[in-house]
Amino acid sequence: MDVLLANPRGFCAGVDRAIEIVKRAIETLGAPIYVRHEVVHNRFVVDDLKQRGAIFVEELDEVPDNNTVIFSAHGVSQAVRQEAERRGLKVFDATCPLVTKVHFEVARHCRAGRDVVLIGHAGHPEVEGTMGQWNREAGTGQIYLVEDVEQVATLQINQPENFAYTTQTTLSVDDTRGIIDALRERFPAMQGPKNDDICYATQNRQDAVRDLAKRCDLVLVVGSPNSSNSNRLSELARREGVESYLIDGAHEIDPAWVAGKQHIGVTAGASAPQVLVDGVLARLAELGATGVGELDGEPESMVFALPKELRLRLVD
């Protein structure tokens, strides 16, 4: 039995930036630092930041006045930003810049009076933040959420000749393409972004899993259950005809999964750290894996800047 690693896998530039913002805010300002929502969807990362002095909350009313709060990588609505300003909270914004790009698109369409269809998963914090960019006082249009092709068939849009679509950044590329095609068939005048809203890291990791699935008879995806992009990776592997499981770490591997397997693929969602992958490799070695290889993959060199106030580290 051998192991093949997907490439790329694990942290993306937006996740790296978000985690570093929390660490440096604690380092610079001292604990505790409040973070609205899990800064990224990974249990190991969140627990580590809690130990450093981060306090995770779901709503701003859990943050004492005049304290510091960090917005998660998933972004927040304009209402949340306004509440933070009203209450005098110091804000560090860890929203992924690629999510912010989608926010700007929605706001621009709103000002232009267009209707907007957001393709995404209801209840996901990124979707809530993006829907919350819509200012009903600034435009005459409406915003609609579509989750699947079936919903397109019954979608009623006020301005079918004057609307655009945007998407959540962590969706299945294949599923999203199907929804866009269905929308365009029903509404030929639909406008879209110049470039896909699904982020480069999501695309690259899905391409890598597709390659992995061709060579393996089992694919393990390291990521937490609430991670959208990690779930999409495991779903994609299964869609490609390969047995696949989403695991938070090595402790969740069932020995029965690997029994009789020849080639085991391992990847990690964009919010899962390499240390968890290392643990999975060690556990697979205990279960009989004798070699580890790595696929060639799309190089990633993107780096997102930190807030100016956090760019210089304190020196002990």
Curated annotation (Swiss-Prot):
A Pfam family assignment: LYTB
Pathway: Isoprenoid biosynthesis; dimethylallyl diphosphate biosynthesis; dimethylallyl diphosphate from (2E)-4-hydroxy-3-methylbutenyl diphosphate: step 1/1; Isoprenoid biosynthesis; isopentenyl diphosphate biosynthesis via DXP pathway; isopentenyl diphosphate from 1-deoxy-D-xylulose 5-phosphate: step 6/6
EC number: 1.17.7.4
A molecular function GO annotation: 4 iron, 4 sulfur cluster binding
Binding-site positions, (2E)-4-hydroxy-3-methylbut-2-enyl diphosphate: 41, 74, 124, 169, 227-229, 271
Cofactor: [4Fe-4S] cluster
Biological process, per Gene Ontology: dimethylallyl diphosphate biosynthetic process; isopentenyl diphosphate biosynthetic process, methylerythritol 4-phosphate pathway; terpenoid biosynthetic process
Keyword vocabulary terms for this entry: 4Fe-4S, Iron, Iron-sulfur, Isoprene biosynthesis, Metal-binding, Oxidoreductase
Binding sites annotated in the UniProt record for isopentenyl diphosphate: 41, 74, 124, 227-229, 271
Cofactor note: Binds 1 [4Fe-4S] cluster per subunit.
InterPro entries with a match to the protein in the record: LytB/IspH
Recorded catalytic activity of this chain's protein: isopentenyl diphosphate + 2 oxidized [2Fe-2S]-[ferredoxin] + H2O = (2E)-4-hydroxy-3-methylbut-2-enyl diphosphate + 2 reduced [2Fe-2S]-[ferredoxin] + 2 H(+); dimethylallyl diphosphate + 2 oxidized [2Fe-2S]-[ferredoxin] + H2O = (2E)-4-hydroxy-3-methylbut-2-enyl diphosphate + 2 reduced [2Fe-2S]-[ferredoxin] + 2 H(+)
Active-site residues (renumbered): 126 (proton donor)
Positions annotated to bind dimethylallyl diphosphate: 41, 74, 124, 227-229, 271
Chain residues that bind [4Fe-4S] cluster: 12, 96, 199
Family recorded in the similarity comment: Belongs to the IspH family.
Summary of the function given for this chain in its UniProt record: Catalyzes the conversion of 1-hydroxy-2-methyl-2-(E)-butenyl 4-diphosphate (HMBPP) into a mixture of isopentenyl diphosphate (IPP) and dimethylallyl diphosphate (DMAPP). Acts in the terminal step of the DOXP/MEP pathway for isoprenoid precursor biosynthesis.
Annotated PANTHER family: 4-HYDROXY-3-METHYLBUT-2-ENYL DIPHOSPHATE REDUCTASE
Protein name: 4-hydroxy-3-methylbut-2-enyl diphosphate reductase
Organism: Stenotrophomonas maltophilia (strain K279a)
